[in-house]
C-alpha cells in the first residue's frame, strides 16, 4: 500500500490526482475508490499503485 494526499478531485468529472508520499502523482477515478469512500483535496489516503495506459493509477483508495 502507498500513502499520500489528495491533490484534487473533481466530483462532476469523477476523477482527480493523489500525490504519493513517494513524490509521484497518481490518477484516481471514482471507480478506484473503495465502496462508501469519498475524497476531497487535502485528505490523507492509502491505495494500491498500478500502472495504467496513461501512467500511474491509484486503486482501492481509502481514507486514513
Q: Which ranges hold each PLM region?
A:
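OB-fold/S1-family single-stranded nucleic acid-binding modules
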Residues: 50-64
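A generic beta-sheet turn/junction motif
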Residues: 10, 21, 51-53
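Short aromatic-glycine-enriched beta-strand elements
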Residues: 13-18
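Beta-strand/loop nucleic-acid-binding surfaces
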Residues: 24-37
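Structural detector for short beta-strands of small beta-barrel domains
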Residues: 1-10
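Short nucleic-acid-contacting surface segments enriched for D/E, G, S/T with interspersed K/R
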Residues: 34-46
